[in-house]
Amino acid sequence: MPNEAALPGEETEVVVVGAGQAGIAMSEHLGNLGIRHIVLERDRIAERWRTQRWDSLVANGPAWHDRFPNLEFPDVGPDAFATKEQVAEYFERYAEKIDAPVRCGVEVSKVRKHEGRPGFRVETSEGTIDAGFVVAATGPFQRPVIPPIVPEGAVRTQLHSSEYRNPEQLPEGAVLVVGAGSSGVQIADELRRSGRRVFLSVGPHDRPPRQYRGRDFCWWLGVLGLWDLTTPPQGAAHVTIAVSGARGGHSVDFRELAGTGIELLGMTDAYEVGDAGTGGVLRFAPDLAENIALGDEKYLELLRAADAYIERNGLDLPEEPEAHVLGPDPECMTDPRLALDLAEAGVTSIVWATGFAADYSWLDVDAYDENGRPDQRRGVSTEPDVYFLGLPWLSRRGSSFIWGVWHDAKYVADHITTRRGYLAYGSN
């Protein structure tokens, strides 16, 4: 797509910042409504899928589900899981299909309100743009978060999951993976399969079945209405989801992971410096069994809801009683390790699969709550004519998924259309 330079003094109706799934979806709906806009992307379309994911990553949802409504994944079966390269190519192809006005290689440094008149001044690496509306479509994965627990130099390598690529990248030795969501579980499993000794620190999580009675969990959440929940269940706002599309897709079972040789630990709690300033001892909370039990209960709850739905609707789906049977607790659960001497265990690397934080330092407007988070309802912020898109639970549980952000973008585009009408009244 051409990298058209932004000219000083250029004007447009809407500036969309970010050309990932949120920015591309936003562009489609604005284009359908005939609203002039520009999508600014500091790197390439879907850059994070290209360069901030490990080599073997695939989508966590099947191709029939994790896509925009108007384009299927080419060369990917409906029940298969697209590779990260195929996902990036999909977004690029979609941008071409809708003729999205994306400008790659343009970084937004600051957005400020005009003084004494409506609209915003958008400062970029290629000049300034005046716009009536701004959509922040950069999503929640801006700044990798590594808890300040283990000091630099305690082990040979510490890196965030966004920097991890493959087992060969890490020095020889055992690996501690902190975080048991989709990223942490898949990375730990890959490292174990490569022959590494692996420790996995497990916190609160939700582990839905990959498939149950012949249907993917994405289908079950749809027919049970769970994608449409508008607020997370109590205490679940920051609970990670452990699900995997790797190796054709499978349910995450922490007991099975322990059976393969991965040692499970509770949440990483504190670090004590070793005698020589290296190695040291990591301490873990005594919450491993509790965390796994809570994940098990959510898993079984979904199975029970699916069974009830099948019976209520007279569906002819295969029985799967074995899915309800949990295996025996491994020793690492019944007698959990609460301290790990890193040098003694041969740990040379720590992979922090501990999530991300948003970064809106470039968006200098009054659109944040007392905790610095976007203050918005369904993407409409408290700062008139500023919108957020691509955030988890923006309007519903499905908001952070490809198909979910598409529907959120339509709502935002319709809201912009309504605002345009009010602002244009009496201007002629």
Spell out what each predicted region is:
Residues 68-72, 390-392:
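A short small-residue
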